[in-house]
């Protein structure tokens, strides 16, 4: 018996751990396929809560809960069979209170399910708050908001405690109720069985044996309350996990067409593109792009100019299909993006976003992310003016970076992400304000190196700095989501329109910054003389 019980425990616990392992892998694989709209509507803390607490609850349901339920069933059948052999009438009377078990289990089980779901939802909120504070720890300290954030977290934690206590109180009722039913059954057996034994219906020995079998039946039934609790928790958590598993990206290619091979860059064309970010049902969308049309021939460099909020980043996000436009279409080498195989499309694009995301790994590992070989990422580091900077680190390319590259400056992170994109040798290079944190001289050196690299890649550069676009083959000026001007740098300046206004504003900002630096230098000189 002991060996059998050990074998059952080993089998079920191993199986539950394996299910947890497979489910975690499946969840992560699904998350990697979901589009930007999903992550825009779902908090990171909520996802993390599902991958930890909910997954653990499912494991407990398919492991310990199944084990105790199996033990209850087999133990119950064994005990009832021997009780029937001793006295069927007394067995029926003993089992009479157990008729209430399904009713209680169903009613309280639903309440447990709902309360545990509420607990898990609030745990997601709590996790999100903690994650945001840890990610923004420097901002919290800089604004001296430590106490305010502690108070906010404490209020959320109080609510989490209250929901947990509500769940615990309900579960606390379930266990004694099952114990009460077991006690009633025991009282019936002692009263009626004792009377039957005194009248000689069966022997005292049979009465004692019957009582022992009843005890064997009662303890598993009392534990059934815990099993119901685990099953309801697991069901609620599995429902939350299915929300991820059932999610699908809306960006899969219609036909999955492969791109024809290309020696250099590719032709990118926007035809009457209109776009707004996804909004909840019933809300009015705010159009970010309206009727945008332009062509970037293979091997050309097109600049996208515009003030903050003009739609530059949204336009760039549409090319690798992080989102799809609601109006118009975008074509790559004459093929609509929606018809292309998504992996093949993105494999030929190097995208450097405004946010310089760096992984917690070595510089070499970050540069090699998606690169074909060491030679490619070493050359890319040189083009991005990063090689000399890396040479200053003691461990050079093996320097371990902190979370999100915390031990790098903003400019260093931008150059690292640029080098990472270049290392893929993409046919289309997208730079979305990718050099905003570097000085204008370094920016000019990088752009000059890209022009003289000798490859014929297509480049689309979005920037609020006009200086980054002056050498582009064609410039598109966005204003309020519309393409209001087209042309080369000199042509647009001669018109005196929106592009000219952007340049004048930039020159004014630069002159103020230069004046401030000169003023500081003058102060430093005067203090030295004094």
Each model region followed by its residue ranges:
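Short active-site loops of ABC-family nucleotide-binding domains
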Residues: 17, 45, 49, 53, ...
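Conserved catalytic Walker-motif region of ABC-type ATPase nucleotide-binding domains
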Residues: 31, 153, 241, 270-272
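An intracellular "coupling" helix at the cytosolic face of ABC transporter transmembrane type-1 domains
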Residues: 36-37, 53-62, 66, 70, ...
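Transmembrane helices of ABC transporter permease
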Residues: 64-118, 189-202
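ABC-type nucleotide-binding domain
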Residues: 261-530
């Amino acid at each position: 018996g002991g060996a059998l019980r050990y074998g059952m425990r080993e089998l079920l616990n191993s199986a539950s751990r394996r299910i947890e392992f497979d489910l975690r892998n499946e969840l992560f694989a699904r998350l990697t396929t979901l589009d930007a709209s999903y992550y825009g509507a779902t908090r990171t803390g909520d996802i993390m809560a599902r991958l930890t607490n909910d997954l653990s609850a499912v494991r407990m349901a398919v492991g310990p809960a199944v084990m105790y339920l199996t033990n209850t069933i087999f133990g119950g059948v064994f005990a009832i069979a021997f009780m029937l052999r001793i006295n069927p009438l007394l067995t029926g009377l003993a089992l009479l209170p157990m008729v209430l078990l399904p009713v209680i289990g169903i009613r309280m089980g639903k309440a447990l399910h709902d309360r545990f779901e509420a607990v898990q939802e609030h745990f997601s909120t709590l996790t999100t708050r903690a994650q945001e504070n840890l990610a923004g720890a420097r901002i919290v300290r800089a604004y001296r908001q430590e106490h305010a954030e502690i108070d906010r977290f404490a209020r959320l934690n109080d609510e989490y405690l209250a929901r947990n206590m509500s769940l615990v109180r309900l579960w606390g009722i379930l266990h004694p109720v099952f114990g009460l039913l077991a006690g009633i059954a025991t009282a019936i057996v002692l009263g009626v069985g004792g009377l039957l034994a005194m009248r000689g219906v069966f022997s005292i020995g049979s009465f004692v044996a019957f009582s022992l079998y009843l005890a064997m039946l009662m303890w598993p039934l009392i534990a059934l309350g815990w099993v119901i609790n685990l099953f309801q928790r697991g069901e609620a958590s599995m429902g939350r996990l299915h929300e991820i598993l059932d999610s699908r990206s809306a960006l899969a290619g219609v036909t999955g067409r492969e791109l024809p091979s290309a020696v250099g860059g590719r032709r990118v064309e926007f035809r009457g593109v209109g776009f707004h970010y996804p909004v909840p049902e019933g809300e009015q969308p705010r159009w970010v792009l309206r009727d945008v049309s332009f062509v970037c021939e293979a091997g050309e460099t097109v600049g996208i100019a515009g003030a903050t909020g003009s739609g530059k980043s949204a336009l760039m996000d549409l090319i690798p299909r992080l989102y799809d436009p609601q109006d118009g279409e975008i074509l790559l080498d004459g093929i609509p993006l929606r018809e292309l195989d998504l992996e093949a499309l993105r494999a030929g694009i190097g995208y450097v976003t405004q946010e310089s995301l760096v992984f917690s790994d070595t510089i070499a590992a970050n540069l090699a992310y998606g690169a074909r070989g060491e030679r490619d990422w070493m050359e890319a580091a040189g083009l991005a003016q990063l090689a000399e900077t890396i040479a200053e680190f003691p461990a050079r390319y093996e320097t371990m970076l902190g979370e999100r590259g915390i031990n790098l400056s903003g400019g260093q992170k931008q150059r690292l992400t640029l080098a990472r994109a270049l290392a893929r040798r993409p046919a289309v290079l997208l730079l979305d304000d990718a050099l905003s944190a570097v000085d204008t001289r370094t920016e000019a050196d990088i752009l000059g190196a890209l022009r003289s690299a000798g490859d014929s890649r297509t480049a689309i550069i979005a920037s609020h700095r006009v200086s980054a676009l002056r050498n582009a083959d064609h410039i598109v000026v966005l204003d309020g989501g519309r393409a209001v001007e087209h042309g080369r740098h000199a042509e647009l300046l001669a018109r005196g329109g929106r592009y000219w206004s952007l340049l004048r504003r930039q020159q004014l900002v630069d002159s103020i910054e230069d004046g401030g630096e000169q003023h500081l230098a003058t102060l430093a000189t005067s203090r030295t003389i004094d």
